[in-house]
């Protein structure tokens, strides 16, 4: 396989790391993205030491970690807001991270994961309703 394949694997594994971190940390999306990027960069460095890809592995995995963290943080936040338990949500998100990591080994899907997960999260964010919009109208005299 060429370097493009290993860069895609690094990006996909970075996304999986970001998803796992978003499910296990109780932090803001920015903090999850930073930690996800750091873990992704470490994964990318490991892949770079093992297979060709040069600095592209490290950059792709770091970007994937940040993208996965931001995307999954939106989903986790919504699940917890709607009454999901922290442990149950973390377990489900860990399973999703495992599935994302498995899909990263399919050629070109790692790239797709790094682009699709933040796009889905942005769509969810736009569709989320205003919280307690009706109560504000009742408070007016």
PLM features: what roles do these ranges have?
Residues 14-18, 64-73, 116-128:
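Alpha-helical transmembrane segments and their membrane-interface exit regions
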Residues 14-16, 40-42, 91-101, 117-118:
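Hydrophobic, membrane-inserted alpha-helices
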Residues 124-141:
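Short, highly charged, low-complexity non-transmembrane loops/tails of multi-pass membrane proteins
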Residues 50-82:
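Alpha-helical transmembrane-segment detector that highlights a single hydrophobic TM helix
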Residues 54-63, 104-117:
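Loop-to-transmembrane alpha-helix initiation sites
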Residues 25-39, 57-63, 82-94:
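Cytoplasmic-side transmembrane-helix entry/capping segments in multi-pass membrane proteins
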Residues 3-25:
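N-terminal signal-anchor/start-transfer transmembrane helix
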Residues 81-86, 90-91, 95-113:
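Membrane-helix boundary connector in multi-pass membrane proteins
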């Amino acid at each position: 396989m060429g370097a493009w394949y290993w860069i895609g694997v690094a990006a996909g594994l970075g996304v999986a790391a970001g998803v796992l971190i978003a499910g296990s940390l109780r932090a803001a999306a920015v903090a999850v993205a930073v930690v996800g990027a750091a873990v992704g960069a470490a994964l990318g460095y490991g892949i770079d030491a093992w297979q060709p890809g040069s600095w592209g592995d490290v950059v792709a995995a770091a970007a994937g970690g940040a993208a996965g963290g931001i995307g999954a943080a939106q989903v986790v936040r919504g699940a917890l807001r709607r009454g999901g338990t922290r442990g149950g949500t973390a377990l489900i998100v860990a399973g999703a991270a495992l599935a994302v990591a498995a899909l990263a080994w399919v050629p070109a899907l790692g790239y797709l994961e790094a682009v699709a997960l933040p796009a889905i999260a942005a769509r969810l964010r736009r569709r989320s309703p205003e919280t307690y919009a009706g109560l504000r109208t009742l408070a007016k005299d």
